[in-house]
UniProtKB/Swiss-Prot annotation:
Record has Nucleotide-binding as a keyword: yes
Domain of life according to the entry: Bacteria
Gene: dnaA
Protein name, per record: Chromosomal replication initiator protein DnaA
Ranges annotated as spanning the membrane: none
Span list, region Domain IV, binds dsDNA: 388-507
Organism: Pseudomonas fluorescens (strain Pf0-1)
Length: 507
């Protein structure tokens, strides 16, 4: 019945979608049924991601509308039917995506929770699909042990499992590894420190604290450490979670009078990996509990890795004793990727998606998308989708078409005028000084920095840049750029100034 229901939905999608969209994304899908589960196979990772993002919601609606209350659970996988075993979906955007399906007439649940099992089990009723996710060695559940007193909560939702989902809730993304992390000058130290911790836990840096802006690879490195630890020792208790999850678990434990179980769980792990620690700010009770957990782990020789969007001393609302302890190990910054690294990231992502990306096209995108890796990946996905829809190869012309709104915004945000104003404010001089003939170091050096930034962040030629800096010759601009590049290697102050200005102008 499930396969026939799928075919019915496909025919409805054929009527709803433009022919090109249907033929590109829906027609290649293969399906097979096993019990009440419908397995849908995509030919590659890119198709899986696109279907998951753009069409999954409508597919579920159609299954519900035409399933007479017996809509099957759905799994998205890469590969083909049983003739070819499915393979893992690298970088699948959802490990276990949940789509809300409210059921107004659902009867209240009364069955007791089943005995714990290593992996989640699914129970399907005619009115709703209920997901029972029993506690594993890597997930804290204060309800465990109290099932006989607490009525189970009905989950009025369907869980759609995309291939790559973990069998337990350690929340590690297994597609984030050291092998597919693109290394460059901006993240070289952070990558080396993470590898040291992964390869020599308890003998490396403890805690390891990674900080930097969004989308720069901190979370990737943290997952890579966790995955490597499990590869070396599959029985290791490695727990990754967002700081808000830690807070939520603690609140739940307090509500259920299970705080001792909470403490035992988090203090018994071999490695605790917490993302975005800045969300502990101004949460005094959470900070108190984490302080004692942190101390217990370090005293026991267990590894702790933390990330934040800023240097720990700069996190307002965080207790000084925590800031001090975060400095016991190694604190490393992850910087925005430089041009060469951005190009390498684009080429690697295109290769993973099995898409041919010319080097000049990658260079064109990398020159204009500078802030973080996440924006780079988003831009590349748009270009690839545009290429698929239009049936054209990826060229600079196609990139201009597919990213025209983004490129227009970038050009508007980063102008030479904006650079001059920002540099003048940073060095506390006047814009007129930058344009003047003054050659004192206090003016000449900021002028050179502004010229170098103008060359890196805009599409203006050297003569054009020289013209807006008081009518200077293009050779003066070229000399300024070379000088600043040299000083960034030898002068820590210039390197820090340039990095700060670059961050201000591109975020």
């Amino acid at each position: 019945m499930s396969v026939e229901l799928w075919q019915q939905c496909v025919e409805l999608l054929r009527e709803e979608l433009p022919a090109q969209q249907f033929n590109t994304w829906i027609r290649p899908l293969q399906v097979e049924a096993e019990g009440d589960e419908l397995r849908v196979y995509a030919p590659n990772r890119f198709v899986l991601d696109w279907v998951n993002e753009k069409y999954l919601g409508r597919v579920l609606e159609l299954l519900d509308e035409h399933g007479n209350g017996l809509a099957p659970s759905l799994s998205l996988l890469i590969g083909s039917k049983r003739s070819s075993a499915p393979r893992a979906a690298p970088n699948a955007p959802l490990a276990a995506a949940q789509v809300s399906q409210a059921q107004a007439n659902a009867a209240p649940a009364s069955a007791p929770a089943p005995a714990p099992t290593p992996a989640p089990t699914k129970r399907t009723t005619q009115k709703t699909e209920e997901i029972s996710e029993e506690p594993s060695r890597d997930s804290f559940d204060p309800m465990a042990g109290a099932a006989s007193q607490q009525a189970p909560v009905r989950a009025e939702q369907r869980t759609v499992q995309v291939e790559g989902a973990l069998k337990h809730t350690s929340y590690l993304n297994r597609t984030f590894t050291f092998e597919n992390f693109v290394e460059g000058k901006s993240n070289q130290l952070a990558r080396a420190a993470a590898w040291q911790v992964a390869d020599n836990p308890k003998h490396g840096y403890n805690p390891l604290f990674l900080y930097g802006g969004v989308g720069l690879g901190k979370t990737h490195l943290m997952h890579a450490v966790g995955n490597h630890l499990l590869k070396k020792n599959p029985n290791a208790k490695v727990v990754y979670l967002h700081s808000e999850r830690f807070v939520a678990d603690m609140v739940k434990a307090l509500q259920l009078n299970a705080i001792n179980e909470f403490k035992r769980f988090y203090r018994s792990v071999d490695a605790l990996l917490i993302d975005d620690i800045q969300f502990f700010a101004r949460k005094e009770r959470s900070q108190e509990e984490f302080f004692h957990t942190f101390n217990a782990l370090l005293e026991g020789g267990q590894q702790v890795i933390l990330t934040s969007d800023r240097y720990p001393k700069e996190i307002e609302g965080l207790e000084e004793r925590l800031k001090s302890r975060f400095g016991w190990g190694l604190t490393v910054a992850v910087e925005p990727p430089e041009l060469e690294t951005r190009v390498a990231i684009l080429m690697k992502k295109a290769d993973q998606a099995k898409v041919e990306l010319p080097h000049d096209a990658a260079f064109f995108i990398a020159q204009r998308i500078r802030s973080n890796v996440r924006e780079l990946e988003g831009a590349l996905k748009r270009v690839i989708a545009h290429s698929h829809f239009m049936g054209r190869d990826i060229t600079i012309e196609l990139i201009r078409e597919s990213l025209k709104d983004l490129l227009a915004l970038q050009d508007k945000l980063v102008s030479v005028d904006n650079i001059q104003r920002t540099v003048a404010e940073y060095y506390k001089i006047k814009i007129s000084d930058l344009l003047s003939k003054r050659r004192s170091r206090s003016v000449a050096r900021p002028r050179q920095v502004a010229m170098a930034l103008s060359k890196e962040l805009t599409n203006h030629s050297l003569p054009e840049i020289g013209d807006v800096f008081g009518g200077r010759d293009h050779t003066t601009v070229l000399h300024a750029c070379r000088k600043i590049n040299e000083l960034k290697e030898s002068d820590a102050d210039i390197r820090e100034d340039y990095k700060n200005l670059l961050r201000t102008l591109t975020t």
